[in-house]
From Swiss-Prot:
Its cofactor is Mg(2+). The lineage of its organism: Bacteria, Pseudomonadati, Pseudomonadota, Gammaproteobacteria, Legionellales. Mg(2+) binds at residues 102, 230. UDP-N-acetyl-alpha-D-glucosamine binds at residues 8-11, 22, 73, 78-79, 142, 157, 230, 336, 354, 369, 380. This is Bifunctional protein GlmU.
């Protein structure tokens, strides 16, 4: 079977009150259009056609790597007109699945069932299969009209509906599947004699009835699958729906969330056994948490891997890091891209790292900046230590070998190497390589000024 998918993404999204096209607004860390394209890809179609119009160049430039065929709708004359723009690119014998870019939570299984419905009754001549839903509040959506035999014979849009039709709770989702040859016959016959003055795709139902093409429907099991986004309130509602489902899936697999309503996933999160996640944590990109990991409140992890038994304390930010087993991080720590910790390391409060590689058992417990640095095993970095890695033009590396003890308030001016088991005295500024097994310090002699008096505040005139 040749499957062609059309995604409608040309709408202006006026009710978003935004300069950003609606389909580029984010849900769970990804643009709405990306959600729909990724779902479509799972159906293994022969092609995905995205119909763009308003803000089209911005959409294309923001999502340059989407595996789609872009089709321009120069004038936004309605959903039927939008689908018509793609038809010259689609073979007559292909099956066409029409999706909306602002309906992001449609599920693959539902779409597979709808495609099967479009073939089930008459494999040689496709039926028109519609995805419908029963909603308690169907306001704003097209209503399904059935005859006395329960057969669909029309869809009436909200703006064209009378009060009797508005009381119907069965709605059309905007998702349908049929043979391309059917669409090529029906779409040129659409009329714009309606309240909007547009060519509605829903009018193909009456044309199918006239042509005696069978119409079948599939009712979505979950109402969120057919919920569209037209304003920021609806975007927020679907965001919470997505997050609640993600939280439930994690808990079903054994993770503990302190509060599933205060959890945000903006990518992929993989948890081992007995993982604990406190409130207000954000996970972005791909995050892997090993067995027994604990994440404290208000933490942000982006593209991070944590080994077994790690604990990240409150208000810590980790990005692009690989952390081995039994490490402790925070509170208020910031680990930037390129940070790697071997097992049993500690990064304490108000420590920032960047391109820092720690070997086993190394600790930096307080108030330090460690950038472009290699640290050996069992190094102790005192409070206030800074690797001075930038000369105003280039970055330089600091190497600290095994067993080094660095006293508090030390500046290491890179490039510099500190030899194994060396000790650096507190308050030192190290500009040259430090020999192993020795004490090195830069001494400024302490002086006492006897008889010195503090200044006295002058009386004002």
């Amino acid at each position: 079977m040749n499957l062609q998918i059309i995604i409608l993404a040309a709408g202006q999204g006026k009710r978003m009150y935004s300069d950003t096209p609606k389909v580029l607004h984010h849900l769970a860390g990804k643009p709405l259009l990306t959600h729909v394209v990724e779902t479509a890809q799972q159906l293994n179609p022969d092609a995905i056609h995205v119909i763009y119009g308003h803000g089209g160049e911005q959409i294309k430039s923001s999502l340059p790597n989407l595996p789609v065929h872009w089709v321009h709708q120069a004038e936004q004359l309605g959903t039927g007109h939008a689908v018509l723009q793609a038809m010259p690119h689609i073979p007559d014998d292909a099956y066409v699945l029409v999706l909306s870019a602002d309906v992001p939570l449609i599920q693959v299984g539902t779409l597979q069932s709808l495609i099967e419905c479009s073939q089930r009754q008459n494999p040689d001549h496709s039926v028109l299969a519609l995805l419908v839903a029963e909603l308690e509040n169907p306001s704003g959506l097209g209503r399904i009209i059935r005859n006395n035999q329960g057969e669909i014979y029309s869809i009436v849009e909200e703006k064209d509906a009378n009060e009797q039709v508005k009381n119907i709770k069965e709605i059309y989702s905007g998702v349908c599947c049929t043979l391309a040859n059917n669409l090529k016959k029906w779409l040129p016959q659409l009329s714009n004699s309606n309240a909007q003055g547009e060519y509605y795709l829903t009018e193909i139902i009456s044309l199918a009835v006239q042509n005696k093409t069978p119409i079948t429907s599939l009712t979505a099991k979950n109402s969120f699958e057919v919920q569209g986004i037209n304003n920021r309130q609806q975007l927020q509602q679907l965001e919470r729906t997505w997050q609640q489902r993600a939280a439930n899936q994690l808990m079903e697999k054994g993770a503990t969330l302190a509060d599933a309503n205060r959890f945000d996933l903006r990518g992929e999160l993989y948890c081992g056994k007995d993982v604990y996640i406190d409130i207000n944590c954000i996970f972005t990109g791909k995050v892997v948490l090993g067995n027994g990991c604990k994440i404290g409140p208000n933490c942000s992890l982006t593209n991070v891997t944590l080994g077994d038994g790690c604990e990240v304390y409150a208000n810590s930010v980790l990005e692009g890091c690989h952390i081995a087993n039994d490490c402790h991080i925070g509170p208020f720590a910031r680990l930037r891209s390129g940070t790697q910790l071997a097992s049993h390391c500690k990064i304490g409060n108000f420590v920032e790292t960047k391109k820092a590689i720690f070997d086993e058992g190394t600790k930096a417990s307080h108030l330090s900046y460690l950038g472009d640095v290699l640290l050996g095993k069992n190094v102790n970095v005192g409070a206030g230590t800074i690797t001075c890695n930038y000369d105003g033009v280039n970055k330089h590396q600091t190497i600290i070998e095994d067993g080094v003890f660095i006293g508090s308030d030390t500046q290491l001016v890179a490039p510099v190497t500190v030899g194994a088991n060396a000790t650096i005295g507190a308050g030192s500024t190290i500009r040259r390589n430090v020999p192993p097994d020795e004490l090195t310090l830069t001494e400024s002699r302490q002086k006492t000024i006897y008889g010195w008096k503090r200044p006295v505040k002058r009386e004002r005139d």
